[in-house]
């Protein structure tokens, strides 16, 4: 499906694009923190130069009050950023033009589809196969794929795309520990997805088969749909108890993050993209423990109290349902 030397192609294209100025690498510094109570390890990356870069551009309006379509950066991607112009037939594989981590990839649909659409079986399998090709277990190089679905998920572009980036060396997302040693299963009314009871925000995880030969479109699709049904039930519960708050267009669109490694698939329902005090925005990477900070005052708060990271993640998501008895309503 992909060139056998894909990782080498990515690295060479990235290095050339940085050298020629087509990729604008964001300088940053990183520090590891741990919320002992929740058992979550965080890597907090401080990138103050991003203060001037908006998370998501507001909708522009013309003189008649009609919305002006935003430019689609994926419609005609720069050749210097293109890894594969034809990836599995329906996609292009590109470099992120403004990465904080080296070799940050974007898997974008050739056809214009909306970022509010769920992942298709082919989206899932293509992503899994890319993770297979990019990971190097001998060198402890692992990758995280993620999808920010909906305005409150932390998405910044409306053209459907997934992203893939290398995990920091020896970094262990909480999903690793949650899924370690467990067999794959399809969640249902009798068997809930895995959640860590110590973590206060809802996160629905399922281990994937250890044998990659057992991972196909059907297995990934059934797993994803089951997790999605459980995730969407959170919004039904929330809208029922917050009817007066449901008039906001963006708030009424279900938003969630999808996170995937070769070992597991995880969905996190999202209530909003930004926490206000201190100021910080999260996309899917935050819910793997990779947190990006732009402001000194935010960094100071997190350094002084790592549990503040977990509280901010909860503010932008929903409370955990660990231990709650599932019903047919949730599936």
From Swiss-Prot:
Superkingdom per UniProt: Eukaryota
Cofactor: a divalent metal cation
Gene Ontology BP annotations: nucleotide metabolic process
Gene: APA2
Pfam families: Ap4A_phos_N (PF19327), ATP_transf (PF09830)
A GO CC term assigned to this protein in UniProt: cytoplasm
Entry keywords, A to Z: ATP-binding, Cytoplasm, Hydrolase, Nucleotide-binding, Nucleotidyltransferase, Nucleus, Transferase
Gene3D superfamilies documented for this protein: 3.30.428.70
Catalytic reaction list: ADP + ATP + H(+) = P(1),P(4)-bis(5'-adenosyl) tetraphosphate + phosphate; sulfate + ADP + H(+) = adenosine 5'-phosphosulfate + phosphate
Protein purpose: Ap4A phosphorylase catalyzes the phosphorolytic degradation of bis(5'-adenosyl) tetraphosphate (Ap4A) into ADP and ATP. Can also use other Np4N' nucleotides (where N and N' stand for A,C,G or U) as substrates. Cannot catalyze the reverse reaction. Additionally, this enzyme can also catalyze the phosphorolytic degradation of adenosine 5'-phosphosulfate (AMPS) into ADP and sulfate, the reversible exchange reaction between inorganic phosphate and the beta-phosphate of a nucleoside diphosphate (NDP), and the synthesis of Ap4A from AMPS plus ATP.
Biological source species: Kluyveromyces lactis (strain ATCC 8585 / CBS 2359 / DSM 70799 / NBRC 1267 / NRRL Y-1140 / WM37)
InterPro entries: Ap4A_phos1/2, Ap4A_phos1/2-like, Ap4A_phos1/2_N, ATP_adenylylTrfase_C, HIT-like_sf
GO molecular function: ATP binding; ATP:ADP adenylyltransferase activity; hydrolase activity; sulfate adenylyltransferase (ADP) activity
Oligomer and partners: Monomer.
Enzyme Commission numbers on file: 2.7.7.53, 2.7.7.5
Protein name from the UniProt record: Diadenosine 5',5'''-P1,P4-tetraphosphate phosphorylase 2
Family designation: Belongs to the ATP adenylyltransferase family.
Subcellular location: Cytoplasm; Nucleus
Active site annotation, chain numbering: 161
Chief localisation class: cytoplasm
Keyword Cytoplasm: yes
Binding-site residues, substrate: 53, 96-97, 148, 154-157, 163, 283-285, 290, 294
PANTHER family xref list: AP-4-A PHOSPHORYLASE II, PUTATIVE (AFU_ORTHOLOGUE AFUA_5G14690)-RELATED
């Amino acid at each position: 499906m992909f060139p056998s030397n894909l990782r080498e192609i990515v690295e060479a294209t990235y290095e050339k694009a940085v050298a020629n100025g087509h990729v604008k690498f964001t300088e940053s510094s990183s520090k590891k923190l741990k919320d002992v109570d929740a058992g979550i390890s965080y890597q907090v990356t401080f990138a103050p130069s991003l203060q001037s870069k908006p998370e998501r551009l507001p909708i522009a309006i013309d003189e008649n009050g009609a919305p002006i379509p935003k430019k689609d950066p994926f419609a005609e991607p720069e050749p210097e950023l293109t890894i594969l112009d034809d990836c599995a037939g329906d996609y292009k594989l590109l470099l992120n033009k403004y990465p904080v981590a080296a070799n940050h990839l974007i898997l974008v649909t050739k056809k214009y589809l909306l970022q509010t659409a769920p992942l298709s079986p082919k989206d899932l399998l293509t992503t899994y196969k890319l993770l297979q090709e990019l990971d190097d277990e001998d060198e402890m190089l692992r990758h995280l794929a993620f999808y920010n679905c909906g305005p409150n998920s932390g998405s910044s572009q409306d053209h459907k795309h997934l992203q893939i980036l290398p995990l920091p060396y020896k970094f262990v997302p909480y999903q690793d520990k949650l899924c370690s040693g467990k067999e794959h299963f399809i969640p249902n009314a009798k068997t809930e997805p895995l959640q860590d009871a110590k973590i206060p925000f809802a996160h629905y995880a399922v281990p994937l088969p250890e044998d990659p030969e057992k991972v196909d479109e059907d297995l990934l699709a059934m797993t994803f749909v089951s997790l999605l049904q459980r995730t969407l039930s959170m919004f039904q519960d929330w809208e029922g108890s917050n009817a007066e708050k449901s008039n906001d267009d963006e708030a009424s669109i279900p938003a969630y993050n999808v996170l995937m490694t070769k070992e597991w698939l995880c969905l996190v329902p999202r209530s909003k993209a930004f926490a206000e005090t201190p100021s910080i925005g999260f996309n899917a990477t935050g819910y793997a423990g990779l947190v990006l900070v732009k402001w000194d005052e935010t960094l100071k708060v997190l350094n002084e109290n790592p549990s503040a990271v977990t509280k901010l993640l909860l503010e932008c998501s929903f409370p955990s349902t660990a231990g709650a008895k599932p019903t047919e309503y949730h599936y």
